[in-house]
């Protein structure tokens, strides 16, 4: 497993809705990447609030994570204020659950 992105809390406090990026919400699934055969970055090309209202995303996320050999994690488009922070600090696009950079997943799906 790669090293998770460590977001500086001070920088996170400068974005309008930091809760979009911290994860840990009810029904989220966190698995050890070393304990599964396949890791999936399940991406949605919009911000967190839009993605979480999408029923298809929630169904596929649950179905993938029902498999003991698969770890699926969600990735959303950052809002422009967070995108600016990420670019200025060199943060890669990362998953919500474990803050793993997207480039480190076995598979990327949209």
Give the ranges of each region predicted by the language model:
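A short, structured N-terminal alpha-helical element that caps or precedes a catalytic domain
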Residues: 1-110
């Amino acid at each position: 497993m790669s090293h998770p992105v460590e977001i500086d809390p001070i920088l996170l406090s400068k974005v309008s809705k930091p809760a979009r990026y911290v994860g840990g919400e009810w029904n989220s699934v966190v698995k050890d990447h070393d304990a599964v055969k396949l890791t999936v970055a399940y991406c949605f090309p919009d911000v967190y609030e839009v993605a979480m209202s999408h029923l298809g995303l929630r169904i596929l996320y649950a179905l993938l994570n029902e498999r003991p050999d698969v770890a699926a994690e969600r990735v959303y488009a950052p809002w422009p204020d967070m995108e600016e922070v990420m670019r200025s600090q060199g943060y890669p696009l990362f998953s919500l659950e474990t803050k793993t950079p997207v480039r480190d997943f076995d598979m990327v799906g949209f």
